[in-house]
Regions:
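A residue-level signal for conserved active-site and pocket-lining positions in enzyme catalytic cores
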Residues: 30, 87, 119, 170, ...
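Right-hand nucleic-acid polymerase module
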Residues: 76, 85, 232-236, 251-326
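Non-catalytic, polymerase-adjacent accessory regions of viral genome-replication enzymes
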Residues: 1-44
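Active-site-proximal segment of RNA-dependent polymerases
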Residues: 2-5, 90-146
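Short, conserved non-catalytic motifs in the polymerase core
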Residues: 25-33, 58-84, 98-111, 176-198
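Reverse-transcriptase-like RNA-dependent polymerase core
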Residues: 11-15, 46-69, 82, 89, ...
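Beta-rich nucleic-acid/ligand-interaction surfaces
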Residues: 106-115, 225-226, 260-264
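Conserved polymerase palm-domain catalytic core
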Residues: 42, 49-50, 120-221, 225-241, ...
Length: 326
C-alpha cells in the first residue's frame, strides 16, 4: 500500500525540489520563463490551492505530431505540468516495483531496445534455437490512451493508495481531460499519463501471467506479443484476453492489427520485422529515415536515427544515409 501522506507530498520543499527536476531541458522555454519570472508567488499560490483543495487543473493546448505516426498531443500549463512531475515522482517507484518484468514502456532501464532483445530471446527459446516452429500472437489495443476509463482507473488506484486526498489530487489531473466521451481518455503529453496507463494495463499483465499462466509474453504500451510452439493455444488465449480487456478494462483490440504468424515468415513488432537470424526495419520507417535525413538535419535527429539503426540489419540504409556507426 502506498502510504505517503498528502500534506508531506505537497509541501513547499517538495514543490521546489520537483521544480528543479522539471526544469531540465526547459529553461529556455517561453512559458517556463514566464512562470519563473514570478516564481515565489506562483509556487506559494499553487501550494495554497493544494492545501485548501481548491486547485483546479488548467486547460490544454493541442497540436499534432507525425513521427513516428500521427498523434494529437495535449500540453498542460507549466504549473499543472509541475504537479504532474510531483505526482509521478511520488508514485513511480511504488508502482514500478510491482510491474511485471516484461512491461517495457516508459520505465527506467527498460525501453524499446530491451523489448526487442527480449523478443529475440523468447523466440530463440520457443523455437529451440530455430529448430522448431515458433508462432507469435501479436496484438495492438485500439485507441489506447483515448480509451482509458476514468472510473476503472480510480478503482484500481484505490487498491493501492490509502490517502483520500491523494485520490482527490490524482482525480483533478485525470478528470482534466476527456475525449468525446466524458470520463474516458488520458492525454498524450502528460507525464502522469505514461505511468497511469502502465498501472491500468498492469491488471491485464497480471491476468496474463497469473491466470492464464503465459510464459512468453511481453508488452510495450498498447503493443503486446505472446510466443508459443502451439498455434491452437494462442488462438484459445486470444479469446480470453479479448474478453478480459473488454469486461475488466473497457478496451478492445485493433482488429486489423491482431494476427498469428510464424517467426520464420517475419513478425512486425515495435517498428522492426523479426526473423530467426536478423531483423529488418519496417519499410515505412525506412522511408521516414531517408526523408528526415535529407538536407541538414539536426544533430539530435542524426544521433537518434544512428542509435535506432544499430539494432538491426540496416547496412544498406546506413550506407545510403551516411549513418555509419561511430
Amino acid at each position: 500500500m502506498f502510504t505517503h501522506k498528502y500534506n508531506n507530498i505537497i509541501s513547499v520543499e517538495n514543490l521546489l525540489s520537483t521544480w528543479e527536476r522539471f526544469l531540465k531541458g526547459k529553461r529556455g522555454k517561453k512559458d517556463v520563463m514566464i512562470f519563473q519570472s514570478k516564481f515565489s508567488d506562483n509556487i506559494l499560490a499553487l501550494h495554497k490551492e493544494l492545501v485548501g483543495r481548491s486547485y483546479v487543473h488548467g486547460a490544454y493546448s493541442a497540436f499534432n505530431v507525425s513521427d513516428p505516426k500521427p498523434r494529437n498531443i495535449h500540453k498542460a500549463e507549466v504549473r499543472d505540468r509541475l504537479l504532474h512531475h510531483l505526482i509521478y515522482k511520488e508514485l513511480y517507484w511504488y508502482f514500478d516495483t510491482r510491474f511485471i518484468h516484461d512491461s517495457y514502456s516508459c520505465r527506467k532501464d527498460k525501453g524499446t531496445h530491451k523489448a526487442l532483445d527480449r523478443f529475440r530471446e523468447f523466440a530463440g527459446k520457443v523455437s529451440k534455437n530455430n529448430t522448431r516452429t515458433c508462432y507469435v500472437l501479436k496484438c495492438d489495443i485500439r485507441k489506447f490512451f483515448s480509451s482509458i476509463d476514468h472510473e476503472t482507473l480510480h478503482i484500481i488506484l484505490k487498491r493501492h493508495i490509502e490517502d483520500p486526498e491523494m485520490h482527490w489530487l490524482i482525480g483533478q489531473v485525470v478528470s482534466s481531460f476527456h475525449t468525446t466521451r466524458v470520463g474516458v481518455g488520458l492525454p498524450l503529453g502528460n507525464l502522469t499519463s505514461q505511468l497511469l496507463v502502465n498501472i491500468y494495463m498492469h491488471e491485464f499483465d497480471m491476468f496474463v501471467k497469473q491466470e492464464l499462466r503465459v510464459k512468453y509474453y511481453l508488452r510495450y504500451a498498447d503493443d503486446f506479443a505472446v510466443l508459443s510452439d502451439d498455434r491452437k493455444y494462442l488462438e484459445e488465449i486470444l479469446i480470453k484476453m479479448e474478453e478480459f480487456l473488454k469486461t475488466k478494462l473497457k478496451l478492445s483490440l485493433h482488429e486489423d492489427k491482431v494476427y498469428i504468424k510464424t517467426y520464420a515468415t517475419g513478425v512486425d513488432f515495435l517498428g522492426w520485422v523479426h526473423f530467426p537470424y536478423h531483423r529488418q526495419i519496417r519499410t515505412t520507417t525506412k522511408h521516414k529515415v531517408v526523408r528526415n535525413l535529407k538536407g541538414y538535419p539536426k544533430p539530435e535527429t542524426v544521433s537518434s536515427y544512428r542509435g535506432l539503426l544499430e539494432h538491426g540489419d540496416t547496412y544498406d540504409l546506413r550506407r545510403r544515409t551516411g549513418l555509419q556507426p561511430l
